[in-house]
Amino acid sequence: MSYNTGKESSPVSPLKKRRASWSELWVNHHHLLSSSPLDLAAKFQSLTPPISKSKTLLPDFTLLLPDLILIRVIQKIPNSQRKNLSLVCKRWFRLHGRLVRSFKVSDWEFLSSGRLISRFPNLETVDLVSGCLISPPNLGILVNHRIVSFTVGVGSYQSWSFFEENLLSVELVERGLKALAGGCSNLRKLVVTNTSELGLLNVAEECSRLQELELHKCSDSVLLGIGAFENLQILRLVGNVDGLYNSLVSDIGLMILAQGCKRLVKLELVGCEGGFDGIKEIGECCQMLEELTVCDNKMESGWLGGLRYCENLKTLKLVSCKKIDNDPDESLSCCCPALERLQLEKCQLRDKNTVKALFKMCEAAREIVFQDCWGLDNDIFSLAMAFGRVKLLYLEGCSLLTTSGLESVILHWHELEHLKVVSCKNIKDSEVSPSLSALFSALVELQWRPDTRSHLSSSLTGTGIGEKGGKFFKKT
């Protein structure tokens, strides 16, 4: 046997080490302070244990899935969380872009540079109205209109022509539409402002599936290109809008529209200045038209008479109309035979002759809706007895109508099945007569909330609360 006579180099146990004195600690501390920052960083890095690559670089099993399978998985995730998935990696970013179907452009450069099409190649709905407005970034004032929203700086919105002065030129909009149409052939809906006939033709040539079109700042000359859309079914024209821009859509434009869009199903006219001839032409040419909306009516007197030629019209909506017809034809003897629904929202109904002519034209309606209409008192509402086949009545925000005025009309509607009364403060629970109560009991649907007190009492039904102490002070 051989023995090693040298001392073993085994480490000394920590328990046997001598404790450092205070002076040694003080010297070591000042030695660290006198060292350079690079030396200190090197020392601390040497003390940090190395990170194992096996713990950080895990295999990405999603690489085994083809794009179609991964897209189906992403489609199961709610839309609110899909944007976070696009931040995972470049592949998921690309796949997320393929799933986006609707986009609202706020920066025109994003469209003109081609980034919109490369980022979202499968778009079906594109809104370009905000992008057509030259608006400097990082402005703190947001202007909201019922048609468009945009940002302005302090003191910049000083004239009524601000919006029109800051619109992109027609040429720029044309080039943008051409780029959009070239990359989004599956486009189904387009919203644009300040375009031209050529811009519409560029879109119609590439996007044969387009079904819905919304034209802001529209004019008669723009509508010359509307006939190129063979499958157009929904059209919204925004002409003259107070405070934003002035643009004229007259009978000429409505006639061009009628001749070019014979497959229209829904039509909305905002601030248009047509009249009887234009509405008549639409009724005769657009045989498939089922819904007509007139907003901010600026039409000529007598336009109501043109509705009689809309033989298949089922819904008529009047929204935000200060006037309906200045001089309706007294010989309105015909009506829209197929009309099923009349909806009046935020309209002035103070002219009795106009309301009488409107109700006569729509006497075949089965559903009547009044929302926040001014001037709808008992006298005006009594004209609604012209409707003989009403099944649904919806009243909201009609503060001048009373309980007796409501009762005098609906008791004559023997086919009434649905009644909804909301926020009509002069209709009182205490004024409901026995005959009106009997009518309520026979209805299929009753929504009765004429004021907050009525809403409270109906919500407390069956609880015993609000019954003059009956819940706590019962006789024994």
UniProtKB/Swiss-Prot annotation:
<dbReference type="InterPro" id="IPR001810">
    <property type="entry name" value="F-box_dom"/>
</dbReference>
<feature type="domain" description="F-box">
    <location>
        <begin position="59"/>
        <end position="111"/>
    </location>
</feature>
<dbReference type="InterPro" id="IPR032675">
    <property type="entry name" value="LRR_dom_sf"/>
</dbReference>
<dbReference type="InterPro" id="IPR036047">
    <property type="entry name" value="F-box-like_dom_sf"/>
</dbReference>
<protein>
    <recommendedName>
        <fullName>F-box protein At5g07670</fullName>
    </recommendedName>
</protein>
